[in-house]
Amino acid sequence: MRETPSSHPGEASVDGVIDQLLFLAHFFGRRADAVQLLADTPITGGRISEAHIFECAQRGGLSLSRAKKGVADFKASELPALVFAPEGGDPLILLRRDGDSFECVQAGIRGSVKLELSALTADYAGVAYFVRPLVFFDTRSLLYHL
């Protein structure tokens, strides 16, 4: 049975997740490395849980928010997004949308590829997260401008 966007991904491949989080951190201009992202994250059998994916993303200066709609309804302004296959393999980054196709970044050295919407919805029907940079606001700086 396929997972819906509102279901939990459970676990995913730690190598694929970290590769994609590193790419996204660099995409948003943040310096990050695998050691920094993993820090004290428990890894069992090469898998990482959903809660730990959120922690690793925060260490890389990223904010993940779960998509409440399917990939077909994603707008170009909502990208990038991190999508998972139901079996929890390597996630895929949806970088840009062009009509019914997406420019996608694959984990590892496989690079980017253009995928049609039909292929995406068939292969990556698991959960999806919209990715944004974390914004740090220092309230002390506000005092200097008053």
Where do the PLM segments sit?
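Membrane-cytosol interface segments
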Residues: 65-69, 102
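Noncatalytic regulatory segments and standalone regulatory/sensor domains
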Residues: 1-2, 18, 41-48, 54, ...
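Cysteine-nucleophile protease catalytic domains, especially the papain-like/related folds used
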Residues: 1-66
